[in-house]
Amino acid sequence: MATKFPKFSQDLAQDPTTRRIWYAIAMAHDFESHDGMTEENLYQKIFASHFGHLAIIFLWVSGSLFHVAWQGNFEQWVQDPVNTRPIAHAIWDPQFGKAAVDAFTQAGASNPVDIAYSGVYHWWYTIGMRTNGDLYQGAIFLLILASLALFAGWLHLQPKFRPSLSWFKNAESRLNHHLAGLFGVSSLAWAGHLIHVAIPESRGQHVGWDNFLSTMPHPAGLAPFFTGNWGVYAQNPDTASHVFGTAQGAGTAILTFLGGFHPQTESLWLTDMAHHHLAIAVLFIVAGHMYRTQFGIGHSIKEMMDAKDFFGTKVEGPFNMPHQGIYETYNNSLHFQLGWHLACLGVITSLVAQHMYSLPPYAFIAQDHTTMAALYTHHQYIAGFLMVGAFAHGAIFLVRDYDPAQNKGNVLDRVLQHKEAIISHLSWVSLFLGFHTLGLYVHNDVVVAFGTPEKQILIEPVFAQFIQAAHGKLLYGFDTLLSNPDSIASTAWPNYGNVWLPGWLDAINSGTNSLFLTIGPGDFLVHHAIALGLHTTTLILVKGALDARGSKLMPDKKDFGYAFPCDGPGRGGTCDISAWDAFYLAMFWMLNTIGWVTFYWHWKHLGVWEGNVAQFNESSTYLMGWLRDYLWLNSSQLINGYNPFGTNNLSVWAWMFLFGHLVWATGFMFLISWRGYWQELIETLVWAHERTPLANLVRWKDKPVALSIVQARLVGLAHFSVGYILTYAAFLIASTAAKFG
């Protein structure tokens, strides 16, 4: 007999209803719950899947390289990066009529093409690529890497090549290898690439496979390195008049600390970035030799966690907090590890979003406004999903893996002991922020509507302005720290040697970049609106995780798992209190918050780019300003993307804008209905199907049953999220591209 899906659960495979399919999809990645799963097998499966993941990433980047080389205009773009629009790939669409073909034949192409808003052209250009041949070579190299990764994944599932459980739990060795090997050596390799290939290319000297062994990256060679005279590598940097990609105004330095931006490209100095990666490499290679393995030297993480002595002083543990039992808890719980990793990666991803625009690393990318907007929004949304995932797996850890006896008296136990204080503090912060921020916005909205805008309550963000002034911004006249040339911040070593300060001060006081933008009352308000969103999302997630094992209402919650809908009518009031429900609610708040973040960023930057900062400053202090002067005003291009007079190259975004709204609205159908609705709907559909000629020739074996409450919410949440992001992506790209190309 053919085995039914899913193979991993005999119990589910024998379910006679359509629940079999739904539950199987829900449990497919929950390896722990699969039939016959052992702890060792679990680790091996996850380990092998990492190679598949890497293969997908390599294939994806390879595809980008290949399509740009084949159908893009990289070589033309390199000749004039500021005025040429980069092409992502060609469009072949049999539905295009003449109007559409004409509209999408753009950027100097002879056939319909898509414009690239990912920044890959700027990245490849900055790192030294100049020809389509370079791109093809990269694509083929990554294809080979992808095949190797797939082979490695397959190999590590073969009995002889499956690592043992003890290998996976050897935390010290893994840390050493990841710190020194993964971070350290790869940073060193990147510094090497920048010094040997990218910096010479930026100075008009081509380095390829034919001459890289004979071309010295620095005229002094390695002599200064071996004699300790390292300062030689910083002498004679590129001048302010350097034309990127040519020898005009170029220097010879390879490792510098100039600060600020290259005047022509408006991006960080390549020599500063090479220096940065070299420094990171040194730090991480040292860090990768800190932990004790078979040589018996270095730190034991377990001993550090359990230590109660700090250089002879009695302490409770690391940071004077009790950590006994944490090593075992962390090392034996994949959910605990995943929670930490997602949280760290989420923070890093959000930092990438902030730094991509304020300190742009790629040549000329700051002048491609649509790309900057797309990259900021992309990274902030990803950060949001990662952060919510961190708390979800934290909650699963507490339900499945947390051992109260093993953690008695340590920091985890302490957090659970005083969870009421944590939750109530987050609650009052959220309430305070919500009422006060909304109160100010509503007050301002009303007085503007009544024609007395002078009655608005406008608060200058003086503390934030002080922080900007401390970093060197002169505009506010605070005359403090780096904005005062006589202060200790400006005169202390090494600044008095004019190492990085002049470049930094030029950059922070320039009106043409996004470094420390000038802020006022509108920024003050939206900052607090975002703070409200962040604190409320955190409140929901923290409560969901800390109450995942049990709460006053339902002390035995842990016995019901992560995603129970309710515990029956016998204990009324136990609906909507599982950790899954907290995750579900937090997703909406997360999306809401990132909406505010991206609205703010985009509107503020539209003003900076257009040279009209007054519109944001005047309209952002009341609600109608946001609705009318940001959303409505900037969606006009989308609403007009195609009309009775034909089409333009924004029509695809206009269509996506409509379609995104449709997907988003579909979400509500699943969110605002409970199980009985679905059961009746399905029985009605089945009844109609069985009485419809021809249709009733098609039968199925599974008895149709309704979506559970949790399943319907998942479908609703998926539609809501996808529609929400799709709608804003279309709005963001079209409104920016309509203004700046």
Curated annotation (Swiss-Prot):
Residues on Lumenal, thylakoid side: 71-131, 196-269, 359-368, 450-520, 611-650, 738-741
Record's subcellular location: Cellular thylakoid membrane
Binding positions (phylloquinone): W678
Binding site for [4Fe-4S] cluster: C566, C575
One GO cellular component term noted in the UniProt record for this chain: photosystem I
Catalytic reaction list: reduced [plastocyanin] + hnu + oxidized [2Fe-2S]-[ferredoxin] = oxidized [plastocyanin] + reduced [2Fe-2S]-[ferredoxin]
GO terms, molecular function: 4 iron, 4 sulfur cluster binding; chlorophyll binding; electron transfer activity; magnesium ion binding; oxidoreductase activity
Protein name according to UniProt: Photosystem I P700 chlorophyll a apoprotein A2
EC numbers for this chain: 1.97.1.12
Cross-referenced Gene3D superfamilies: Photosystem I PsaA/PsaB
Keyword Oxidoreductase recorded: yes
Residues annotated as transmembrane: 39-70, 132-156, 173-195, 270-287, 335-358, 369-400, 420-449, 521-545, 579-610, 651-672, 709-737
Function summary: PsaA and PsaB bind P700, the primary electron donor of photosystem I (PSI), as well as the electron acceptors A0, A1 and FX. PSI is a plastocyanin/cytochrome c6-ferredoxin oxidoreductase, converting photonic excitation into a charge separation, which transfers an electron from the donor P700 chlorophyll pair to the spectroscopically characterized acceptors A0, A1, FX, FA and FB in turn. Oxidized P700 is reduced on the lumenal side of the thylakoid membrane by plastocyanin or cytochrome c6.
Major location (coarse): membrane
Membrane topology, as annotated: Multi-pass membrane protein
Encoding gene, per UniProt annotation: psaB
Ranges in the topological domain labelled Cytoplasmic: 2-38, 157-172, 288-334, 401-419, 546-578, 673-708
InterPro entries, sorted: PSI_PsaA/B, PSI_PsaA/B_CS, PSI_PsaA/B_sf, PSI_PsaB
